[in-house]
Amino acid sequence: MNILLLTSEFAPAAGGIGTYAREIAAAAVRLGADVTVAAPDYADDGVARADRAAPFRTHRFRGGLHSIRDLPGKVRLARALTAADGHDVVHAVDWPFFLPVALARARTDARLLMTVHGTEINEMQTAGKRLAVRLAGTFGPRAEVVANSEFTRELFLSRFELPADRVRAIPLGVSEFWFGPRADRDAVRRKHALAPDALVMVTVARLTQRKGHLATLAALQQLAEPLRARITWLIIGPDGEAGHVAQLRAAALAAGGDIRFLGRLPDEEIRDIFGAADLFCLTGVPDPSGRVEGFGLVYLEAGACDLPSLGCNIGGVAEAVAAGRSGLLVAPTPEAIAGAIAKLAEDETLRTALGRGALAHARALSWDRCAAATYGLAPTDDILLPPVDREQVALAPFAAGDVAPAAAGSRGEE
């Protein structure tokens, strides 16, 4: 099978879209496909060296972070690449390539796939974008839409009138990297000056309002002092909105306790910290701007390191955290979060059981399985998705004409 992927985000830029493109392409190669990835070069001469080490071909086009000015160039690129080779599948990995691939459909007999990740569905509800989608026939009869979760699928179907059988939910996978060797737990705790009896809670996410750091902080302040004094909270991830970051840092300072902002860290160090921690906590909250948590890959990455998760039951998080098996899911309120933190902190047996469940859940969701289901490279009958609460779709209403921020990535980058 000959597969062409087109993505507006890729290495060296960090983000969830780039991770998706890289991992599904590599998995498709492992399953026997011939894969080419078209990705921006970010004006970085060093990308060619890294590309040579990849198991797939990489076609770099001139560009960086997507803007509307790039659309004509992406249309020309999609037309040229789809006409050049006998592709069996042309895959628009993210929304900036939806319209270009749709406009190139006359040049190829290939299957046309488009992956939706969550937030961009709401972003496409402005009058201008809906008109462009309709005029281009973006989701016409040949388009197959792949959603990263059942939540995202339901959200898409609530916004666009497509037959339900043309929109599939295929869960993401976990890179083998996260199952790899970690530094000794005690050594990592000594390196970070973590008390031997401390309960270490770690969060990995960009410091943005919707990731719920303030909700977690408010929850910690509700805990009884003896328990609160035991908890060390390690916050990993780059800064997001400047105003929010300043508010969060000031609130953490005023709250007291052992709260540490570690900033952006390499994956190897994050993996080591996961191995030294007791609990992964990411308590996202509804965002009125229309941004949603389409899946939540970072919960699975923590799970690959035997770490149980605490999350809020919003968006697609319920499909990344198996409630009661790999972690706990609660309402996005400080009171509910505080109760769950206390429950996990005081019950080591529960944490151990959920950690084992988190590892099993992460193992069950591989990138090979994701690629097989997406491209039809292998049987996929064993891919099961948890049921979705359709009322969750209504948590983040988005009216046509509203403007949401541009989509970004995951795992500390979103």
Indicate where each model-derived feature is located.
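Short His-centered aromatic/hydrophobic patch
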Residues: 92-98, 116
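Glycosyltransferase donor-sugar binding loop
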Residues: 41-44, 174, 232-247
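Conserved acidic donor-binding segment of nucleotide-sugar-dependent glycosyltransferases
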Residues: 323-324, 328-335, 343-349
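A short, well-ordered alpha-helix in the C-terminal region of glycosyltransferases
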Residues: 336, 343, 350-364, 376
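Carbohydrate-associated surface elements
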Residues: 151, 173
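Acidic donor-binding loop of glycosyltransferase active sites
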Residues: 275-290, 307
